[in-house]
């Protein structure tokens, strides 16, 4: 993999890094503690999975770029333009969830993102089948994050659904 490949692999990580740098003072553990779902993975697991998925998706975009001749030509506009839009939406979800604390709006963006990733896979498939297949783990991950976000949104609307802390008996 050439230098361009490394750039494509690293590019998806730029958004989360910038979001963290500019909003770290506003982030809090608002979705932890009693709000934490029993089936939600630990924060470090979420971070590792997200990092791996961003790297795989970045590599897939490199394969498409390479197969379309590289450069910045017109054939790249739709496949990589759609990819750029989905990256932007993905980064927006981070802001909505972790800094604005709006799981409802984050959920809407996640559903939009899901549709964009499916569209990207369909457009990439004739160009590079492997690139399209590499988006499947991303779709699976979006399913998990959408379910988590849905539950947090539902619990914020209806307190009766919120998980109650269990009392430990001595």
Curated annotation (Swiss-Prot):
It comes from the Eukaryota. One of its GO terms (biological process) is import across plasma membrane. It is a multi-pass membrane protein. The chain crosses the membrane at residues 3-23, 45-65, 78-98, 104-124, 130-150. GO terms for molecular function: 5-aminolevulinic acid transmembrane transporter activity; cholesterol binding. One of its GO terms (cellular component) is endoplasmic reticulum membrane. The keyword Transport applies. It is found in: Endoplasmic reticulum membrane; Cell membrane. InterPro entries: TspO/MBR-related_sf, TspO_MBR. Expressed in erythrocytes (at protein level). It holds the Pfam family TspO_MBR. Keywords: Cell membrane, Endoplasmic reticulum, Membrane, Receptor, Transmembrane, Transmembrane helix, Transport. Belongs to the TspO/BZRP family. The C-terminal region mediates cholesterol-binding. Homotetramer. May also form homodimer. Cholesterol-binding protein involved in the redistribution of cholesterol from lipid droplets to the endoplasmic reticulum. Required to meet cholesterol demands during erythropoietic differentiation. May play a role in transport processes at the plasma membrane of erythrocytes, including regulating VDAC-mediated ATP export, and import of the heme precursors protoporphyrin IX and 5-aminolevulinic acid. This is Translocator protein 2. It comes from Homo sapiens. The gene is TSPO2.
């Amino acid at each position: 993999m050439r230098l361009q490949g490394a750039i494509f692999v690293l590019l998806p990580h730029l958004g989360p890094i910038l979001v963290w740098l500019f909003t770290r003072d506003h982030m809090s553990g608002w979705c932890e503690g009693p709000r934490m779902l029993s089936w939600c993975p630990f924060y470090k697991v979420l971070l590792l999975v997200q990092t791996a998925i961003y790297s795989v998706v970045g590599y897939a975009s490199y394969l498409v770029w390479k197969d379309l001749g590289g450069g910045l030509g017109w054939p790249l506009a739709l496949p990589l333009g759609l990819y750029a839009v989905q990256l932007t939406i993905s980064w927006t979800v981070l802001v909505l969830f972790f800094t604005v604390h709006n799981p409802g709006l984050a959920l809407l963006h996640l559903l939009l993102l899901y549709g964009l990733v499916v569209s990207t896979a369909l457009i990439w498939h004739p160009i590079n089948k492997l690139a399209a297949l590499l988006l499947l783990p991303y779709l699976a991950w979006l399913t998990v994050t959408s379910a988590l976000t849905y539950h947090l949104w539902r619990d914020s609307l209806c307190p009766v659904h919120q998980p109650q802390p269990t009392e430990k008996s001595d």
